[in-house]
Amino acid sequence: TVPDGNSILSVSFIGYQSQEIKVNSRRGINVRLQENVQSLDEVMVVAYGVQKKATLTGAISSVGTEALLKSPSASVTNSLAGQLPGVSSMQASGQPGADNAKIFVRGVGSLTEGGAAPLILVDGVERSFYQMDPNEIESINVLKDASATAVFGVRGANGVILVTTRRGEEGKAKISISSNVGIQMPTRILDVADSYTTASLFREAQRNDGVADDQLAFSEYDMERFRLGDSPILYPNVNWYDYLMNKAAVQTQHNVSISGGTKDIRYFVSLGFLFQNGLFKQLDGLDYDNNYSYTRYNYRANLDVNLTRTTTLKFGMGGIVGNQRDPGGSGNVWKQLTWSLPFSSPGIVDGKKVVTQSTRFPGVKMENQVINGFYGYGYDRKVSNNMTFDLNLSQNLDFITKGLSIEVKGAYNTDYSYIKTVRGHVETYTPFYKSEIDGSGLDVEDLDFDKSLVYRITGENMMKTYGTGDKKRARDWYVEGSIRYNRKFGEHNVGALLLYNQSKKYYPNYPNKFWDVPTAYVGLVGRLTYDYKSKYIAEFNIGYNGSENFAPDKRFGTFPAGSIGYVITEEKFIPKNDFLTYLKVRASVGLVGNDNMSSNRFLYLPDSYSINNSDWLQQAYQDKNGYIFGLTNTAYQVAAKELMLGNSNVTWETALKQNYGIDAYFFSDRLKL
């Protein structure tokens, strides 16, 4: 029972319409939820605006908050897997704080994988959404064909992802609290050979190479020790995956949000927290955490204010604070895990790092073993702080002509990060039989051979040193102004958009070439839409913009696209029925471009050279400058090396895209194709 007779019970379920029922001190309530059949009158976010879903002629896929929250991954990119047709994601790492997936729209459509990334806009501004809290996302729309992306010109060839954040709605304040606890585990761990098997295969390989039995890296005595496992310090057998890694790692994610407002003021505020732990075990003898971890704080505040009956001001602020922790010297830890030999070290023994002598088994390379690069080297802590600000002012101009409006938008983003390093060093203990190093010259098979263990100590336990590593500062701004027109004349609906935008990024490619030269874009956008009774639909889009990567006379281009649609079920000869609810055929064709050359910029600049540059062989082996000419002359000569050849004719990639599609709803919109 509920003592307050004015209490309201809110019932909701994914896929059904929510209901609010007054309790009135009743002991039992029966609630029947209606299926949430999406109306064709609903609007969908498109480039620089919204359109009714019924009149869309472009290829657009969408996913909402509920679907994203079904798989609460640390990175939103991993939640998109399997959610959107035509969108593929590839996750190359599970490292906490660095597990973002690469996203491709309709495959890799560029010369390089790096150049095939789609353009990502959050609330209409180019930003990363990888570390956003899914609780603050209203929808993610993916624009796939030329009709939907032509307005982005030189940046639309690989598709566009539009992320829209949540905003407040008129009504009482609603407080939402969510908490998720989960585990992460590797999809598959390699099966590795034990010491005896590894040594046996190595002996077999040496015999195949013609090595005599008395010259084999592993003697019969060595093989017997591996087989019996009776000398685990000198002849260890370690599965490094099992030794260093846990089966699973814990991830927690929490969020609290509040939204509501009045007719004139609406608000949405969200606070999120995420902690992602790594898979590695804490090793003995260390006074710091040797595991990977990532802590993230998300915050967002969106405010909509009706200044007058015709003027609306929208303000948005968001931020992400991240703290990523990585063991020092562990950049290639997964490669080292795979390469590390089971007999390279017994691991940490009584709080001491013990490693096998590198020459114990002649011819066996034991460099780059994981215990050497992972234990005792300290850690790196990367702190990042990202903030975004948006301001949008829209003015209804119905007093001039019905359906006319103007909109002005400005945005500012700032990103700052730095790395703090904590470095240390620990003693290394190398085990020997006593008679191996006492100068007796005895063979291990001799009865007087002393097999008691002694250790040779190298290095020293050093106090931790602290330093600051790489710093990154970036900022950018974006401005946009548009005139919009939407009006209905009887059964005819017309719409138009004329938009100007400009942006500039400072320190965009740090630390790559030309990182200190800002990146700038400027462009014009046009759109015309028409439909008759939502049955016959036509749309024309055009983008005129350019890229500073190319020569001035090849910097700007025009990118047009057109599309048509025909809703067959609106015809009178198809009676209304529950089997085929909606059927639309659509087609589009358009020209789009791609100027994403990864880290390469200003490809039109004259040829460049470097003087007295080191050849990589000299760098690797002798650290000498210049080059050697001839076989007998060993003196390094000053020389010039080509760096980049300029090409004033190079321009963006272009793609002429065609798209044909059918939208069909069956069984009262329960099945959608």
Which positions does each model-derived feature cover?
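Generic recognition of well-structured, leucine-rich alpha-helical segments
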Residues: 87, 184, 296, 322, ...
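Detector for glycine-centered tight turns/loop "hinges" at secondary-structure junctions
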Residues: 124, 351-353, 359, 439, ...
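Acidic, glycine-rich flexible loop segments
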Residues: 213-239, 253, 334-368
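Short, solvent-exposed loop/turn motifs
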Residues: 17-20, 126, 353-355, 441, ...
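Short, small/polar-rich motifs associated with maturation and membrane association
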Residues: 1-299, 313
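Extracellular/periplasmic, surface-exposed regions of secreted and cell-surface proteins
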Residues: 68, 116-117, 252, 302-311, ...
